[in-house]
Amino acid sequence: MHCTVFFLLIACAKSSYGQTRSVSTAKSESKSDEYSYNSDAIDQSRLLRGAVNPVSENMALRKFIFDMPEMLRPEHFEPIFINPAAVKEVIKDYLAYGEALCGSGYDPRLLALFGVRPTVLKQELMKAKGVTLSVMPSSRKRPRALDEVESEVENFRNVLKDFFIPPTTTNPSKLIPDDIETLVPEHVSAHFNSLVYLMYFAVLHFDSQELATMSSSVLLKYALQKNLLLREKIESGTLGEWERDFRLMRVLNVYKSEQT
């Protein structure tokens, strides 16, 4: 009797152990299978949710990053592939080269990246497909600390606030005093000159948003005096393009008054 019970207990234990082991093995194999494709599955689900950039955009961003590895902070390498807003952080650092915000000899295309929304900037990088590299200043200085660059950007914004008032519906014309150059300290003159380049870029691409904040008559007259390319662009623009936007017409009217 006791032997029978003993053997039954052994049989039950073996059966239970076998079932437990098979379930455990199945779970283990299932988990192994899960991990074998988990990365791709996560990437695919993120793509479907829009949590990461499409592959083609990532490729373009990778080219932009790794064609200029010495010019970017290492901590920006990875985030840029995950978060489009990281592009703007990279550009902030990028603008530090060649004293682009406060020096001379910078490319207007480079300055035009200042203050651009991350989504717009990303689109521009996609369209450039490597051409963006041509806006890099010749000076290859070591990048400054990000907080220093951010401070410089903030200073630049403050200069614009101090010496330039955006147009409003109640006061659309008299936005900058005629004697602006006598009011601005000499060390700030480069900042004001940068507005000329931004104005040129805005007109070059018929960017009404840029023109909305820069097309006062005084500033435009200053730009026309300083920049021959701006004159040429206005002269080459078709009337239809200008008539479609009242800001462009404002620029054209100021240009005509400057000619008389």
UniProtKB/Swiss-Prot annotation:
Keywords recorded for this protein, A-Z: Host nucleus, Secreted, Signal
Motif (RxLR): 46-49
Domain remarks: Has the canonical translocation motif RxLR, but lacks the canonical EER motif, which characterizes most oomycete effectors identified so far.
Signal peptide region: 1-18
Subcellular location: Secreted; Host nucleus
Broad class of where this protein is predominantly found: secreted
Gene Ontology CC entries for this record: extracellular region; host cell nucleus
Role according to the record: Secreted effector that triggers a robust hypersensitive response (HR) in Lactuca serriola LS102. The response to BLN06 was visible as strong necrosis. Although effector recognition is frequently associated with single dominant R gene loci, the recognition of BLR38 requires 2 unlinked loci that display incomplete dominance.
Disulphide connectivity of cysteines: none
Family per similarity comment: Belongs to the RxLR effector family.
Position of sequence motif Nuclear localuization signal (NLS): 136-148
Keyword Transferase listed: no
Originating species: Bremia lactucae
Protein name: RxLR effector protein BLR38
